[in-house]
């Protein structure tokens, strides 16, 4: 519906479960095949999920008689090699292991491992902040030509610059909301829309005094975030991503669920956040 209304759209997406599946297949077959590096997992999922989105968009455009095309850009996102996240890897990935296997993988392969909430041991990797979308100019050019662009999938493939200025993949995971925020800023988007599992943002979510929010300013959103209303790993990174977008010149942002995007654009529902 956004595209029918004339919006030029760039689409980001997550890839957590899909990367998990690749890692699991890789672990199960490691006695016969080399394991897939984490940055390659990101690239693989960008291609596969991008293909699915492209195909479904093609079919929907055809159904609606729209003269539009969708294209996927395998997207690298630069991170700072000195980001403190690399000194404190905390993002669990892959399967659970017992302590003996975890310590063996640490010694043999240099993995960082940690016990995960008493359920076993897992590999942990850094989750650094995104600095620059490497393919930004290509994404912007495609949007300007009327393409629907699928990009920064899974937060983008994390890369660092070597001393020579070359790019090199790293074993890390970038938050998809943070990467999408950076992209929205860098292409000077008019609107940053986050599609999630709830129709609106709420204070005291899931409690008897839950309160849905139709609109709030950036200052109000920050105050609510600092008061602990938004859960880490859930709504909090979405609010933080929007705050960064608005602080860097963005005009407005919306949070809603997929089935209500059209109504949210017309102001009927969703949570609108403004500077």
Annotate each PLM feature.
Residues 1-275:
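C-terminal catalytic "cap/lid" subdomain
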């Amino acid at each position: 519906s956004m595209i029918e209304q004339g919006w030029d759209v760039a689409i980001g997406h997550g890839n957590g479960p899909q990367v998990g599946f690749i890692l699991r297949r890789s672990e199960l077959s490691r006695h016969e095949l080399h394991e897939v590096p984490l940055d390659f997992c990101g690239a693989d999922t960008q291609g596969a999920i991008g293909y699915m989105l492209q195909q479904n968009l093609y079919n929907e455009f055809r159904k609606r008689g729209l003269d539009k095309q969708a294209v996927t850009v395998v997207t690298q996102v630069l991170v700072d090699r000195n980001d403190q996240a690399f000194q404190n890897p905390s993002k669990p990935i892959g399967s659970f292991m017992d302590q003996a296997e975890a310590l063996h993988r640490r010694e043999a392969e240099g993995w960082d491992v940690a016990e995960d909430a008493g359920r076993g041991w897992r590999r942990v990797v850094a989750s650094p902040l995104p600095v620059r979308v490497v393919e930004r100019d290509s994404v912007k050019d495609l949007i300007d030509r009327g393409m629907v662009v699928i990009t920064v999938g899974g937060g983008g493939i994390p890369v660092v610059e070597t001393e020579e200025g070359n790019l090199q993949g790293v074993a890390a995971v970038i938050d998809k909301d943070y990467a999408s925020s950076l992209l929205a800023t860098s292409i000077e988007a008019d609107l940053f829309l986050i599609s999630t599992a709830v129709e609106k943002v709420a204070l005291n979510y899931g409690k008897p005094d839950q309160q849905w929010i139709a609109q709030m300013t950036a200052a109000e959103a920050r105050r609510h975030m600092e008061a602990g209303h938004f859960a880490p790993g859930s709504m909090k990174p979405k609010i933080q991503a929007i705050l960064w977008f608005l602080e860097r010149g963005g005009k407005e942002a919306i949070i809603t669920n997929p089935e209500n995007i059209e109504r949210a654009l017309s102001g009927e529902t969703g949570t609108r956040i403004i500077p």
